[in-house]
Amino acid sequence: MVSLREQWNEQARERQREISARKTETVALLQEANQERVRVAQQQKALAIELKNQLAQFHEQLETSVGNWRQETQEQLINLEETRTANAQQQREALFNFRRQLTADVWGETESDSLKVEENTPFVA
């Protein structure tokens, strides 16, 4: 027959084994949770680095696009100015020829004996 004290000691040892088993299980779960936390943190860090790199690449592409747009716009402005200047010159020449022809028609002169009309001379009828 087992004494009461031995039973009590056996129950205490059993409780200690259960507590020890729970501690071991808890430590394992905490280690697993910590490893998962570290893995998630590493993934987030990698994603943050990738996002930063993509943002830097986008910024470079944006600067390149803006630079190209500015250059194209400047070229278009230069072309427009050249076209405007050429059109103005053509209009001056057409007006000069019109004045000369009108003077010749009014005075009945031919081109060879008509008075020379300077480019900036206003027409006087």
UniProtKB/Swiss-Prot annotation:
It comes from the Bacteria. One of its GO terms (cellular component) is gas vesicle. Keywords: Gas vesicle. It is found in: Gas vesicle. Belongs to the gas vesicle GvpC family. Gas vesicles (GV) are hollow, gas filled proteinaceous nanostructures. During planktonic growth they allow positioning of the organism at a favorable depth for light or nutrient acquisition. This is 17 kDa gas vesicle protein. It comes from Dactylococcopsis salina (strain PCC 8305) (Myxobactron salinum).
